[in-house]
From Swiss-Prot:
It comes from Salinispora arenicola (strain CNS-205). Displays ATPase and GTPase activities. Belongs to the RapZ-like family. Gene3D superfamilies: P-loop containing nucleotide triphosphate hydrolases (3.40.50.300). Keywords: ATP-binding, GTP-binding, Nucleotide-binding. GO terms for molecular function: ATP binding; GTP binding. This is Nucleotide-binding protein Sare_3328. The keyword GTP-binding applies. GTP binds at D70, V71, R72, S73. ATP binds at G19, V20, S21, G22, G23, G24, R25, S26.
Length: 295
């Protein structure tokens, strides 16, 4: 295709998947196939533009194409950033998905399957992970979506990707409301963090202690507390007020994290209610309860 062609009027949906080794790229690739994407694994960065143009020309199922890339050389980050920039200059609007996980989680995953890290060489596993993170820094900065798989199993990761890309309109801003426990750490990919610990804790109500915020009893208790309604309404208005700006800036995915002490009662109830209210507006919203079952 001649240089400078404008492809902005095409309906090709292009996804670029990269991330750390052991993070779950293969699971992401399979999930994208499940929702109708034509997936090309281990594609060299130099062929990204050619692949995008072929997908546009081919039409049909190939119009939804995903390219999965991993670190193959020390020039990876520079090459990928340049390739993404070229795609945008040629009129494509790729979604860039970066799959990540905590170092400790990656080490456990490699040790559980008795594999060495591809960049480990003669050094330690942690050394290979550190080298790869350095090479991927520029690629991570380009990401529209950062999927942290530290606390996701294979099925949860698959569902997360299907929620993101299963709809035909893959360019719309999507919101995931994540409940979590502060004692387990704040989700690293959060755009907004809401602290629900000002509400009375159902843990101290004997008949509610063993139930979660997904139950009617706990939800009614939490949402009926003084300040709960104003809290949910304020964050609903805040998120609704920012979505148009995020979309103008090209942001595709928004993570709203709602925390309480352990991530079982208050944060879960608030997250469910917040997602429900956002879903009644123009926003596509879903929930993820990161720390349920960890206590």
């Amino acid at each position: 295709m001649p240089s400078g062609s404008d492809l902005s009027d095409t309906d090709t949906t292009l996804v670029v998947v990269t991330g750390v080794s052991g993070g779950g790229r293969s699971t992401v690739a399979r999930a994208l196939e499940n929702v109708g994407y034509y997936v090309v694994d281990n594609l060299p960065q130099a062929l990204m533009l050619d692949m995008a143009e072929l997908a546009m020309k081919a039409g049909g199922a190939a119009r939804r194409t995903a390219m999965v890339l991993d670190v193959r050389s020390r020039a990876f980050s520079t090459d990928l950033v340049g390739a993404i920039r070229e795609l945008k200059e040629r009129g494509f609007a790729p979604w860039v998905v970066f799959v990540d996980a905590d170092d400790e989680v990656l080490i456990r995953r490699f040790e559980s399957v008795r594999r060495s890290h591809p960049l480990q060489g003669e050094g330690r596993l942690a050394d290979g992970i550190a080298v790869e993170r350095g090479l991927l820094e520029g690629a991570r900065d380009q990401a529209d979506v950062i999927v942290d798989t530290s606390h996701l199993n294979v099925n949860q990761l698959r569902r997360r990707i299907e929620e993101l890309f299963g709809a035909e309109d893959a360019r719309r801003l999507r919101v995931t409301v994540v409940s979590f426990g502060f004692k387990y750490g704040v989700p690293p990919d959060a755009d907004f963090v809401c602290d629900a610990r000002f509400l009375p804790n159902p843990y101290w109500v004997p008949e509610l202690r063993e139930h979660t915020g997904q139950t009617e009893a706990v939800s009614s208790y939490v949402l009926g507390q003084e300040g709960a309604e104003a809290f949910v309404a304020t964050y609903t208005d805040l998120i609704n007020a920012t979505t148009a700006g995020f979309e103008r800036e090209g942001k595709r995915y928004l993570t709203v994290a709602v925390g309480c002490t352990g991530g079982k009662h208050r944060s879960v109830a608030i997250a469910e209610e917040l997602a429900a209210r956002l879903g009644r507006t123009v926003i596509a919203a879903n929930t993820q309860h990161r720390d349920l079952g960890r206590e």
